[in-house]
Curated annotation (Swiss-Prot):
Keyword flag Isomerase: yes
UniProt source species: Staphylococcus xylosus
GO biological process: D-xylose metabolic process
EC number(s) on file: 5.3.1.5
One GO molecular-function entry: xylose isomerase activity
Protein's name in the database: Xylose isomerase
Main subcellular location of this protein, as a coarse class: cytoplasm
Gene Ontology cellular component annotations, sorted alphabetically: cytoplasm
Residues holding Mg(2+) 1: 229, 265, 293, 335
């Protein structure tokens, strides 16, 4: 059975009016020594694409999906067929999932694991047949009512144990399927109020949880990259991994920073009061950029995520990613869903085409900027006072407050220069327009 009645999506260039074609993403086209598919490493998210029903806090699900009329296990099997057809037709090489995305929870942990075993075998067969790969998997330790107080940070030790058992199973799945990364997102790892929260105990327990996970991965020979996905809130009022800087400090405190990097989501940066580029830059500067959840927050809605369609944002994001040397073994996972009003099955294809093209265009622009040393030249000019004289001594740690005081006494007039920030923004616009015109 075919779930998507279209041909494989092809690159037709920016002048094409075919909605089911790529305008900027040409998988085999090389930029330098790498193809676009190697540089972008696109991934489809199982949850938003194949399990989400487009419900929201004010309305029931409206998504029309061929598999939704089936019973739970048959539905899970149908979704396996659907996602591999989807990846083939969209030319996406990777996928990601939570444990409960791929199979239903049973009446007990044992039954849940048995359900997982059945579906994982089907996924493994499909992976072997198609060459598609698992970018990352993770454990859903936030949806079920047992996680009302958290998972690793729960006040109930039995919940901690249950969450740990689920992670153990997910790590075994990661090894079996060759998952290139393993992600932790702590949607319930935080608090509603400090009035009844032992923050130190909860953070200590969270660190213990991560250490046990890494220890078990080593024990079974799983070598995938471990990733933490920061988010400041939603669903919990205050989540402990608020942003990259906060989570980095946590990892450093508990001596986990050599074992983990970050999976950075664009909309989580927005919720934290940062730009997407800020989070990517902080992670890159600290050698902690591991992977990306590609989406954008709706400017009027905090809780929603859409496919990326902002070329300005994707250009700056791809600049950071290219300067990072790429994302491998991470990738660009479309942790996004269609708008509620885009409820047809074909909209799943169309939204991914939009997101892939937007990142591909951003890649083209960012690559050209790096070729031209655009930002590098700006930085060199702005900070040139630190390349010689007293500035160089400051950078190299070869001066003191006393010497700087003596130096300052001899300054007659301090002359600052304008950043011309508006000119820089205008030049970025011109890069985007020039890339488009060139194609």
């Amino acid at each position: 059975m075919s779930y998507f009645d279209i041909n494989k999506v092809n690159y037709e260039g920016p002048k094409s009016n075919n909605a089911f074609s790529f305008k900027y993403y040409n998988p085999e086209e090389k930029l330098g020594n790498h193809s676009m598919s190697e540089l972008l490493r696109f991934s489809v998210a199982y949850w938003h694409t194949f399990t989400a029903d487009l419900s929201d806090p004010f309305g029931v699900g409206v998504a029309e999906r061929d598999w939704d009329s089936l019973d739970e296990m048959e539905k899970a099997k149908a979704r396996v067929e659907a996602i591999f057809e989807f990846m083939e037709k969209t030319r996406i090489d990777y996928f990601c999932f939570h444990d409960v995305d791929i199979s239903p929870e049973g009446a007990s942990l044992k039954e849940s694991n048995e359900n997982l075993d059945i579906i994982v075998e089907l996924i493994k067969e499909k992976m072997d047949q198609t060459g598609k790969k698992l970018l990352w998997n993770t454990t859903n330790n936030f949806t079920h009512e047992r996680f009302v107080h958290g998972a690793a940070t729960s006040s109930n030790a039995e919940v901690f144990a249950y969450a740990a058992a689920k992670v153990k199973k997910s790590l075994e799945i990661a090894k079996k399927l060759g998952s290139e990364n393993f992600v932790f997102w702590g949607g319930r790892e935080g608090y509603e109020s400090l009035l009844n929260t032992n923050m130190k105990l909860e953070l200590d327990n969270l660190a213990t949880f991560f250490k046990m996970a890494k220890s078990y991965a080593d024990e079974i020979g799983y070598t995938g990259q471990f990733l933490i996905e920061p988010k400041p809130k939603e669903p919990t009022t205050h989540q402990y991994d608020t942003d990259v800087a906060t989570a980095h400090a946590f990892l450093q405190k508990y001596d986990l920073d050599k074992d983990f990097k970050f999976n950075i989501e664009a909309n989580h940066a927005t919720l934290a009061g940062h730009t997407f580029q800020h989070e990517l830059r902080y992670a890159r500067d600290n050698n902690m950029l591991g992977s990306v959840d590609a989406n954008q927050g709706h400017p009027l809605l905090g809780w929603d995520t859409d496919e990326s369609t902002d070329v300005y944002d994707t250009t700056l994001a791809m600049y950071e990613i290219l300067k990072n040397g790429g994302l491998a073994p991470g990738g660009l996972n479309f942790d996004a869903k269609p708008r509620r009003t885009s409820f047809k099955q074909e909209d799943l294809i169309l939204t991914h085409i939009a997101g892939m093209d937007t990142f591909a265009l951003g890649l083209r622009v960012a690559y050209k900027m790096i070729e031209d040393n655009f930002f590098e030249n700006i930085m060199d000019e702005k900070y040139k006072s630190f390349n010689e004289g007293i500035g160089k001594k400051i950078v190299e740690g070869e001066t003191s407050l006393k010497e700087l005081e003596d130096y300052a006494f001899n300054i007659n007039t301090i002359n600052n220069t304008s950043d011309h920030l508006e000119v820089i923004k205008s030049q970025i616009n011109q890069y985007i327009l020039n890339i488009n015109n060139k194609d």
